[in-house]
A protein has these predicted regions:
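Short "domain-exit" segments at the C-terminal end of structured domains
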Residues: 165-169
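Soluble catalytic regions of large protease machineries
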Residues: 1-160, 164
Length: 169
């Protein structure tokens, strides 16, 4: 099944390392589409499947590889197998610890999902305006998104501001 829409996250600068806060923000971003579905339509669809998969990979790496777990601290719980082929992470722990890791990953994803819902509810008017713009134009750039967001947050009429970027030929 194909995607009806997607978000492409383009880094502002080339980076090789991410902070814990940046990874936590990525999780919230990945889960934002599912959270918006629940808020706006009071239901969820299969549309967020890839986002959930990506969020789970990031959360699991935070816990097992990056030492970003309160419970496990700096303990390396996974290593890369065939780094240059599949790059798959393999757990270096017993079944009980693997179960605890799953629990930590679920908690991190749950917190991130709740944070996404909180932010979307807090900025619901901007969400609706941006969705309306996206429906009429089919695509939106980061700059256009931020213009609409800032205008709504400042209480400005959208009809009074120029939103779309000039077309390049």
């Amino acid at each position: 099944m194909g995607a009806l829409g997607y978000v492409m996250q383009v880094p502002e600068e080339e980076k090789y390392l991410n902070t814990q806060k940046e990874l936590e923000a990525m999780l919230v971003g990945y889960l934002g589409g599912r959270a918006a579905e629940e808020i706006v339509f009071d239901t969820v669809t299969t549309g967020a499947a890839n986002d959930i998969e990506q969020a789970t990979k990031v959360a699991r790496a935070m816990i097992t590889q990056y030492g970003m777990s309160q419970k496990f601290g700096l303990m390396g719980l996974a290593s890369q197998e065939n780094q240059y082929l599949s790059g798959r992470a393999v757990l270096n722990c017993g079944d009980d610890t693997a179960t605890e890791i799953d629990h930590e990953v679920m908690q991190l994803l749950h917190y991130s999902y709740e944070e996404a819902k909180r932010l979307l509810n807090e900025h619901r008017e901007a969400l609706d305006k941006i969705a309306g713009y996206l429906i009429s134009r089919e695509t939106i750039t980061g700059k256009e998104f931020m213009k609409i967001f800032r205008a709504v947050e400042k209480g400005l009429e959208l009809s009074l501001i120029h939103i779309s970027e000039p077309t390049r030929h």
